């Protein structure tokens, strides 16, 4: 028996090395893996056709409800002033003080947008990745619960799972050039002013801090200088960091403006934000840059995330607002985001679990945090 176990282990190890690490076997394996994923995405409309959350709202406010779910891009926590960074990248959010809840221990489930965002829009955990192609996403959940749903994207359609899930919203709008995130707020304002009756969910998919960083903000928003477009070399590190930090500072302006607008409305409202993944920025001797590498880093995993609740929300649903504040330092992954926004809206449904919501007193801090690797396995 021990010899059988040893042989099986050695065989599996050899198979893993051949498949994942030896050229050209790994190339062939990855081509097959990508082809299989492509087929699953293409078949999504069919495989998810009969899916229902059986959602219902357990409580409603005494005025209309507006919830904003903001998905950031490539925004690592290490460069946010709110997380202890020594540059003023969050002056406006910092000025809000205790009005915002900063989730300080949030890790992404994937360091690539095309994997991370679908999971942020879904109830699926990393260890059940194939369920992504059977279940509907957040727009469908809120539709069932009686909300009018809007998906506003500052990124181009790619024909991938993000677009499949986004199309379940009642309305889907892709922004045009220039792709500055403030246009998401401008569009949201027009919608809110035109629709004064419905409870609303807005999903705002930002361009955030996507490379090239200097293109993510208008020139008048350039605070850290010089921020020239330069070759990715260590000698230009400060200019690269200046541009990246300017993009974070522009996100600060954008989020604080969304919060300010929500606060001005006669509505029960809340905002939940998280970046999809972080970024490497030539941080150490490895000189790693960007994200999506097969072996990840703390800078790619640790993302910025926060919540805000209106005074009306805190009056009507004090338990959820207080629970979120109590979990500022709780260990979490972006899996909690779907669960948290559903809980904030007081939605009960299949695949909605209070113990996975940061806005629930019963949030479970003991759950092992997993990451989806480049072979779609939870590690």
Where are each of the predicted segments found?
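Active-site-proximal alpha/beta segments of enzymes that process anionic O-linked groups
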Residues: 7-69, 74-231, 302, 333-335, ...
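Flexible internal linker/loop segments at domain or repeat junctions
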Residues: 220-237, 288, 312-321
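Metal-dependent active-site segment of extracytoplasmic phospho-/sulfohydrolases and closely related
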Residues: 68-69, 250-290, 338-345
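A short beta-strand-to-alpha-helix junction
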Residues: 129-134, 238-249, 293-302, 314-341, ...
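Histidine-centered active-site microenvironments of extracellular/periplasmic hydrolases
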Residues: 84-88, 267-268, 272-318, 354, ...
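Short, small-residue-biased leader/transition segments that mark boundaries at the very start
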Residues: 1-6
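A long, amphipathic alpha-helix that forms part
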Residues: 52-53, 186-189, 228-271, 301, ...
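C-terminal cap/loop subdomain of S1 sulfatases and analogous C-terminal strand-loop tails that border
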Residues: 279-284, 346-379
């Amino acid at each position: 028996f021990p010899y059988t176990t040893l042989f099986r282990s050695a065989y599996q190890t050899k198979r893993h090395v051949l498949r994942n690490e030896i050229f050209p076997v790994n190339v062939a394996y990855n081509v097959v893996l990508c082809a299989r994923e492509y087929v699953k995405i293409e078949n999504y409309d069919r495989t998810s056709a009969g899916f229902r959350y059986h959602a219902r709202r357990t409580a409603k406010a005494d005025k209309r409800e507006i919830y904003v779910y903001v998905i950031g891009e490539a925004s690592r926590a290490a460069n946010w002033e709110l997380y202890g960074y020594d540059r003023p990248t969050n002056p406006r959010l910092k000025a809000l003080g205790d009005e915002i809840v900063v989730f300080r221990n949030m890790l992404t489930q994937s360091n690539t947008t095309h994997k991370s965002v679908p999971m942020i829009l879904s109830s699926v955990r990393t260890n059940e990745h194939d369920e992504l192609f059977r279940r509907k996403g957040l727009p469908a959940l809120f539709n069932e619960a009686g909300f009018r749903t809007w998906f506003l994207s500052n990124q181009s359609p790619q024909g991938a799972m993000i677009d499949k899930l986004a199309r379940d919203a009642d309305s889907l709008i892709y922004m045009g050039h220039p792709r500055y995130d403030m246009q998401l707020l401008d569009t949201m304002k027009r919608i809110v002013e035109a629709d004064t009756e419905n409870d609303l969910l807005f999903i705002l998919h930002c361009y955030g801090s996507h490379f090239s960083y200097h293109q993510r903000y208008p020139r008048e928003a350039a605070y850290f200088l010089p921020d020239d477009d330069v070759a990715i070399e260590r000698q230009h590190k400060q200019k690269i960091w200046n541009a990246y930090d300017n993009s974070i500072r522009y996100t600060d302006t954008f989020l604080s403006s969304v919060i300010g607008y929500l606060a001005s409305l006669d509505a029960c409202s809340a905002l939940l934000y998280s970046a999809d993944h972080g970024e490497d920025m030539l941080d150490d001797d490895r000189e790693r840059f960007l994200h999506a590498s097969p072996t990840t880093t703390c800078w790619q995993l640790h993302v910025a995330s926060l919540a805000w609740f209106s005074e009306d929300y805190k009056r009507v649903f004090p338990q959820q607002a207080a629970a979120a504040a109590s979990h500022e330092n709780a260990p979490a992954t972006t899996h909690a985001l779907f669960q948290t926004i559903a809980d904030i809206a007081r939605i009960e449904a299949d695949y909605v679990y209070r113990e996975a919501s940061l806005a629930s007193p019963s949030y479970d801090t003991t759950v092992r945090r997993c990451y989806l690797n480049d072979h779609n396995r939870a590690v």
